[in-house]
Amino acid sequence: MEKKVYLVLENGQFFEGNAFGAEGEITGEIVFATAMTGYLETLTDPSYYGQIVVQTFPLIGNYGVIPADFESANTHVKAYIVREWCQEPSNFRSEGNLDTFLKERNVIGLCNIDTRQLTRIIREYGVMNARIVNSIENLDSIVSELKNYRVTDAVKNTTCHEITISKPEISKNKVVLMDFGAKKHIHKELEKRGCEVITVPAYTTYEQIMELKPDGIMLSNGAGDPADNVSIIEEIKKLLQTKIPIFGICLGHQLVALANGAKTIKLKYGHRGANQPVKDLVTGNVYITSQNHGYAVDHNTLPPSCSMRFVNANDNTCEGIDYQEIPVFTVQFHPEANGGPRDTMFLFDRFITLMGGNK
């Protein structure tokens, strides 16, 4: 018999559901993700660090567990909420089911709740803190404690701890990848284009990076409030003065903007899913993109040397920036998205061109 558990929201509302995966109680920032596929990528994406993720698609786990699709070696979500999970997955690549996977990774799961209603609440009230508990006898006390929770040290807890180097058979460009919680497929797309990729920890200094003599620098995705990363922003300021080509994705995009004096804002409920339309303000083209972020660059604070290149077609928030005086461009969305869409993969080719093409 499935164990009864509860989801308590910071605004005092609660849901009754059933436990699956690991059992226990956990607190996190609750967000929703709208993608119909890619649940394995979601669970292993470091950008979800500290968060309780709600899947809006009603049935999750249909194609089982496929390690080759993981975005990192670890799971980073605090807990995982679905309407229903598939107990008998069907896929020739599958190595297990979702319930067993969550148990092995000690990730608490919650099922059999109205995820549609829960998503509506998050849309109306905005992202908030939540807790999965075994009892709601002390509801007022739980709600009071929730108001004090904050995701902290996200980059510190998701970055690598040592430098690693990977080379394709024919290496044409040397790229330093600053790992703020990098997804595996950023690395893959660079290597596919003939790049030697040197992955370095987030707190690597300007001087240490210069010793590696890179042709280009990639600033990865990551979790948390971008403004918290004060020391990293200072190092990026120095890197921007070198005129070495730089490509930033997601958190990397935000950190470059902050290094240029712009500001970031927290979105009401963020962009998390694989169906976000983005308009290129130069060409007029519209692309469908994969996104996972709760903060955005405030385009009204950009200095004159920057121009907004991409804008979200739903809410007009900043999705990409071109820097006019230096070989730098950044995007808020994920061109490397595994499982798709792959409309903006050409941005990796633009980065290669900035480095001088295939030498």
Task: List the predicted regions and their residue ranges.
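RNA-binding accessory domains that recognize and position tRNA/RNA substrates
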Residues: 1-207, 211-212, 226, 338, ...
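Short clusters of small/polar residues that mark proteolytic maturation junctions
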Residues: 19-20, 57, 291, 322, ...
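Proline-centered loop/turn at the N-terminus of a beta-strand
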Residues: 108, 174, 245-247, 263, ...
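Active-site glycine-centered loops adjacent to acidic/histidine catalytic or metal-binding residues
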Residues: 114, 250, 293, 334
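Active-site-proximal beta-strand elements of phosphoester/diester hydrolases
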Residues: 174-179, 289-290, 329-333
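Cysteine-nucleophile active-site neighborhood
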Residues: 216, 220-288, 296, 340-350, ...
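Catalytic beta-strand/loop cores that center a nucleophilic Ser/Cys/Thr
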Residues: 284-326
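A glycine-centered loop/beta-turn motif at secondary-structure junctions
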Residues: 320-357
